[in-house]
Each structure stands twice: as C-alpha cells, then as structure tokens.
Amino acid sequence: MTTLATRNTIMRLAVASACSWIAVSAAHAQQAAAAADAQAQSQADSTQAAPAAATEPEAKVDNVVTVSGSRISARGFTQPTPTTVLSSEDLAKTAKPNLFNAIAELPALQGSTGRTTSTNSTSSGIQGLSSLSLRGLGPIRTLTLLDGQRVVGANVTGVTDVSQFPQLLVKRVDVVTGGASASYGSDAIGGVVNFVTDKKFEGFKFNVEGGQTTYHDDKNGTLQAAFGKAFMDDRLHVTGSVEYGREKGIESPGFGEVGPNGRTWYKNPAYQVRPLSATTDGKPQYTVIEHAQQYQYAKYGLITNGPLQGTAFGLNGEPYKFNYGSNGVPTGTGAVTGCVNPFCIGGDLSGSVGAGTNLAMDLTRQVGYTRVGFDISPDHEIYFTANFGKVKSHFSPNPGAAKNANLTIQCSNPYLPASIAAACAANNITSFQYGTANAIFPENINVYPTREMRRAVVGANGRFPLLGKEWSYDAYVERGINFTDIIVKDMTLNARYNAAIDAVRLADGSIACRNEAARAAGCVPLNIIGNVPVSAAAWGYVAPENGPQQHTRQQQDVGSFNINGEAFESWAGPIAVATGAEWRRESYRVSGDPYGNGVWPDTPNTAQYPADPVLNSTVGNNWYAGNYHNASGTYNVREAYLELNVPVLKSATWGEANINLADRHTKYSTSGHVESWKLGGSWKTGIDGLRLRAVTSKDVRAPNLSELYAAAVVVNNIVQYQGNTVTIQQRTVGNTKLRPEIARNNIFGVVLDRPSWAPGFSASVDYFDIKLNGMISSLTAQQEVDLCVAGNQEICGAMSLNNPVTTNNYVTVQAFNLASLHSKGYDLEASYRMNLKDWNLPGRFTVRGLVTRNISFLTDAGVVGTIPSEGAGNNLGNTPRWKGLMSQSWDTDKYSLTLTQRWISSGKYSNEFIECQTNCPVSTVIHPTIYNNHMKGAFYWDLGGTWKVADKTTAFFKIDNIGNVDPVAAPQTNLSYGINPALYDVIGRVYRVGVRYNF
C-alpha cells in the first residue's frame, strides 16, 4: 500500500533508529507480570486516584496487546508513546455527572472547554461544548475518538462533544500524551483521547445520582442504564445504553458587586491601566484593583460629558449626584479626577455587569447508543452501531446591554425631568453624552444552544491466516451528522434601540420616535432615563421575540480499512506490521437570520423577520451581539499508512528492545499532500524494573472547515498606510489557501515498573518537546497592512489600498499560517500499592501522584511589532507551571474511600509584564509595567467513598472541593466575572450521592 518513497523513508528511519535511539516501553502501570496485578493496577489508575501518565491501555487476548497510541497488535509489544488508562472503575470513583469532567482533571489536559467556560460569549459557538485539550494546544489539536473511530464534530472547528458520547458502556479511556498523526491522522498534535466501549457486555446495569453545591444551586441528576445480551450460541451480541443528565447551572445574580446565592468572593477585579505617555513618572502602568467602578455608565443612566456630567437617574427618572469611587470628581470633559479611565475604585457599584454572567450553564444530556454484532463465522464479525446524542444548554452572557457613554440624548427628550431640561438651557447645550447598564430591561440576554448528533457505523472485523501467521483486520464506513441550533432571546437591535431612545413630543402631545421612517415602520419610544418600567410594546420593538439564530449542519463520512499482524519471527521476536487506508469527507452549512446575516436569497425577510428601513439589510450585523452569518464548505481526505514494530534486542543480560516506526501519506482536497511519521523505541533494560522509551514524530493538523470557509463579514474600518489614514472595507472571510500545521514531537522517558525489591511501586518521568510551525492564526487589518509593507507578498494579495475609487479600498482579514509555538516540559508519576493484610488490616491501600510541569509555552504570532509570548505560568491562560493530581485510596470488598488533591501552582498574570512599584522603566506595548504580577495558585481536596449494600448494589458519595476554596481573581481590562474556569474551580463545594446496580 505504500509508495517506493514511503518504503525508503521507513528503511532510513529504521537504520537511524537502530543507531541513535534507545527507547522505552510501557507506561505508568505497565502490563503486569500477573494478570490479577495488571487488572488491579489498571483499576487503580483513575483520574480520582491520580492515574499514571505512563499507564498503557491494553487489552490482552492470547498474549496480544492492543494500545491506542499505536495501530500495532503483537505479542510482547510495548509502545514508546506514554499513554494513560482510565478504567470504568476509575471513572466510577470520580462520581462525575459527565465523564468529560473526570478526564479534564488529568494534568496533561489543559485548555479543555466545558459548561463553565465561554459563558460570557454569545457568538463563540463553543458554549456548552465539552471538548478536551491536551498540552494546552486547544481542542482542535487533540483527536478524540470513539472505539478508535472518528466522530463528527459538534462545532465548525471540527471538535467533538464528549457529552454526546455513550458513557455508561465505556470500559476505559486511553489518553495518549504524544503526537499520533502517523497512526491516526490529522489533529493528533497534542495526542489522542480514545473512548473504548464494552462491546461484549453481558447483563444490566443502572446508575442514578444527584447532587448540588453548598450554595444549594447547580442541582444535578443523572440516570443511566445499559444492557447486553448474547443470542444464537453467542454469535449475536446486542448492547445498548440510554442516559439522561441535567445540571441546572448557576443563575446570573444580575447587576452589582454580588456573587450568586451567597458567594461572597466576587469583588469586581480589573486592571487599572494608565496611558503609556504617563509612565515616565516611574510608576507602573497596570494595577490590579478590586471594587472596580465603570464610570461611563450607571445602573439606570448617567450623563458622562459636559456641564451636567455626574448626574445619574434613579426611581422614576429622579436625578441625583452619582457617587464616583476614588473620591472622583467629573471634569465635564468625560474624565473623572482621581480615576484612571475607565475605572474608579468603589463608589456606586450597583450598575456593575461583571457578575451577571452565569458561573455554570444549565446543561441537559440525552444519549442513546446500541451495537449489534453478528459472528458470521468464528473468525469474522459484522456489526452495526448507532449513536444519538442531544445536548441542550442555556446561559446568560451578561445582564442588560450596557452602553458605555456612547449614547446621545437630546435635551428636548420628553422623558427628561424638567430640572434637567432647565439645566440644559441654563448651560446652553442641546444634547449630552449618556451611558446606562440598561438594568430596566425586563430580561437578561438568554442563549439556548442545542446540539443533536446522529451517527451510524457499519463494519466488520476478524482474523485470517497470512504467511503462516494469524492476522487481524477491521473495516468500517461511518456517517455522522450534527445539527447545531443557537437561539438567542432578549437581544436588542442596535438601530431600533437608537431610534427608540431618541424620543420627541408630537403636536398632539404624544411621545414618539424622532425618526419618521422608523416611526412608520412601528418604532415605539423607549424611556431609558432612570428606573422606569419598560412597556411590552417598546421591549417587543427593540428586542423582538425572534432574536439571533444560527442553524448548522455538519456531516462526516468515513471509510476505513486496517490490517495488522506478525509478518515473521526474528531472533528477538515477531516483526509486526499494521497498514491501512482511509477516506474521509467533512462538510458543513451554516445559516443565520436576516438581521444578523443581511437579507439575501438564502436568508430573506420573513414574517418573523420583516423588512425594516432602520436596519442594514445588506451587511446585517444589526444585533447588539449574536450576528450570525451564512457559510458552507467541504473537503475530502485520502490517506494510507504503514506501521512497523521491529524487535532488536532480547537478552537475559541486556533486556529487550523494540523499534516502532510509522509513516502516513495524506492528500487533502484543499491543501494537497502532507506526510507524517513516527520513530520510537522502547528498552526493557537488564536492570530490574527499569525501562527507557523515546519517540520523535512529525504530526499535522489540517485547516478545519471554519478556517477554510468562514462566513464573510464586512464592516468599515480605518488603517494606517504609508503615513496616511485609509478608510477600508474590512472583509473577514475564510482562507482556502491555508496549509496544514506541522509539528515535531519529541518524548524521552524513564519508567521504573514494580521492581522485585519494591513490587508495589511504579514511577515514571517523561520529557516532551513540541515545536509547531505554520500555526493557523488570525490577524487584525492593521497587522496585515504592516506585514504587507514589510514585504509579505502572500498577505499583500489580500488587500487593495491605492484604489482610485477610495470606497473600493479593502483589506481581507483571514487566517494565515504565520504563527509558531514551542512547548516543553515533563510528566511525573509515582504510585505505591500495598495489601494491608501484611499488617493484619483489611483491604488495599494505594497512593498515587501525577504531575505535569510546563517549562515553556512560547508562542510567536509572526507579526511585525510583536515578540514571542511565554504562556507557561501565565495563570490567566491554560498552561500553569505545575498541575498535579494526587490520591490516596483504601479499598475492601465492601467499602472504599478515596482522598484526592488537585493542585495548580501560582503564576503570573502575564510573563510579559515587568513588575515594579517605584522607579519603573517607561512602559511599552510589548513589555508593560505592573504593580503586582503574582496570581495565586489553588489546592483542592476531594473525598469519595462507596458501600456495597447488597450483592448487586453499591451506594456512593462524593464531595468535591471540601474546603470550598474560592476562585482566584483573574482581572481583565473590562468588567467581567474576573475568574479563569480553565484552571480554577469556580463553583465551590459540591455534594453528590448515588446508587449503582449491576446484574
């Protein structure tokens, strides 16, 4: 199946590997010398019990080991790529309502998205998406599989939603913490997470659990049932599962400096940022503050400029003097003395919108799964699987729709109190600038994403004789479709809002909208002067019942064929081969509403979205947020691979060693041909229990549908070009000329696996080094212009800045292969297991620790005027210096207790900050100065236990975050919740109890 070039590549790699690599086998808890020990070790390697990063997934059949980090199945094979195994027992101990939460706690998992992330965004598209990210490289660079097969994406970036997977039938999860593109194809730069189901499950099992936080919110419940039965003398096997889960989330508390339901830790954190020009005084530019007050608006309205600046409005529009923090005094020019734009400290915080975001989304899971397998002969099975998964979520990104001093109110507005109208006349002004949190709105913005997956697989697997050996094969075809609907309620239309607040009194004494065209189209005036009720008619006009909508259909079609076996025996053992080919097609179509997308043949005006002269019907972008646009695209992939395992040493003195090689050739319909490869080895040394392993690989990620075919969005903008200010059309589109990202992964590890002098002890350390080039990233219009001026001809082709007709000047803003990343660090694990009967005590005791150390996470944007940015230890991001998971477990046949510790090291707000209090250097854009650059870490304790109340019934409990540790403040330049849910526990103490029934 491979070309001559491929074979030559393999041979060259084999020779090089034999000369220069000493490699490793297995992992944290390796294949045990005894089957019982192996099973016990695997069962102990859980997230809850700090699973071993080196633990290799294994399924033993006739001494053949299958591991997810490789396509090879062979006697005695130990792969060089570190792999963590979580068994079903391990996952059950975590007692999580969603397996995603258990896996995301692994230290190597960094940057995963769940229901506590992106709750402040309307348009990101990842809300409620449970996607896994290895090494902080993002979910798009982590390949998530179900039974070794790809799953249709739940987002236009192609990432899957683990919440749509069947979970009760999962017998193990394999986490491959190294590049695996040569074995599995695109996206496996960070590694692979493979969910393996129990295809031969017999019996029935049922799980029910419920819980809530210590604040009596985020109440959750889970119901799961699974069955399996063999028929026709065990030739026909049917398994299935149904699951329902609901996590009710944590509602928005609304406005003000208040946390939801008694959480007292929220203190309006923010950056107070002085102008660069002011930093010549030796003081820092940035200061982290609490009780930040946004002085450009108030809860019910604030005059922000002119002689009346500082006048706020309360109940029934009554004016009063606004209480600025920092003893601030308005200057009449928009500034406030004693404050640094846009924040004061303290004062009237009732209009703060930062705490108005949901801490956790309301999420509902409904999943159904079945597999029917039939043995057409003792060596051949055909099968069919069907998977239905529906995930619904709901959240509020922020209360109201704050307007930061960007409104103009006419002094003739009939809603103004007479005293303010008189003050306007006395000060000879006809209008003033105004800001409001819009707390009068009857509803917060509400976003309702729904993802529904339908997936079917038809396949066959079996064994056949070849070259005097037994070989195995598997083949399948798959179709997966994901429908995503995002419905937004209570969202305002900007143009209608502006028309409605610009009110006049007509000759008949009635109040109406000033804009006659808007008035003719149904404009209803809106009073935003003070705390006054909003009429249903006014609310229906500015925030119509049919808000922003996005409908997406993604489809994935796959055909795959793989064979593997032992080609022949060498003096050191069997030479194993795996080879195969795959064809895949990915496509999507997304459509928005006519107010967001613009009115076009595929999004016409309808009765739900009638024509309105006030709105921009061509470009769209009429909503306050949630302007979804139409797009579509497709690509296909053809690829073939070859993988070899070559034993090179078998000696009673020197031990055993093997070399693992893989090569994959892939052709994308969009970006052409690309090659990925892997060269690794493992050496079980002659030293008792000591193993070494190493692997180097070239891994790839092809551009996804969103990057290639992003919806076109056009807005007006200005750029600086050749000393002139140029007005442009900024056209944001996809880029079909993108190339695959290329990564080089290098791993070297040492494993001590239960030596005879310490049979219960295992430890490992693995060093990793990842270099990613041609990383796909987006630029601003100005950055593209600067790169063109610097001589980048590819980017020059994306703009026209010297057009004789100046209105035809444009810059196409799109993604390019410009950025690069270099990450390095190491994984540590140690575990000790002992039987307490040696101490005349009941049960077994296990201690484990798993830690990831990020030495560097350096990102280079590849943009003029920037420098590489160090992300390791940036605790506002995803990659802390240290992330750890430790556990201590006591197990008997009737009871178990597990104490777990989760640890995030302290870090910095940014590694580019220069920390100083006095005598600071002049701040720069690249290296700003800051008063305090320390961000605290966190340490959490969890406790869980089980009680076997009957032969088939087990009760369990779990307490997460026993100490109810508050989240660490994560300041931003704008008011937000000021937390980082990607690293920290933001929910608080959680209690869960449940019952499992098996027969």
What function would you assign to each model-found segment?
Residues T2-P107, R135, Q224, G228, ...:
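N-terminal Sec signal peptide and the immediately downstream disordered periplasmic leader
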Residues S131, A611-D612, S697, V714, ...:
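C-terminal beta-signal and terminal closure region of outer-membrane beta-barrel proteins
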Residues L4, A495, K771-N773, R902-T918, ...:
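C-terminal beta-signal and adjacent terminal beta-strands/loops
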Residues V156, E257-R263, E318-R365, Y369, ...:
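Surface-exposed, low-complexity loop segments enriched in small/polar and acidic residues
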Residues Q149-T177:
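Short acidic/polar hinge/loop motifs at secondary-structure boundaries
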Residues A104-Q149:
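Extracytoplasmic beta-strand/coil segments of soluble accessory domains associated
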Residues L99-A102, S130-S133, D161-P166, D187-V208, ...:
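N-terminal periplasmic accessory domains that precede
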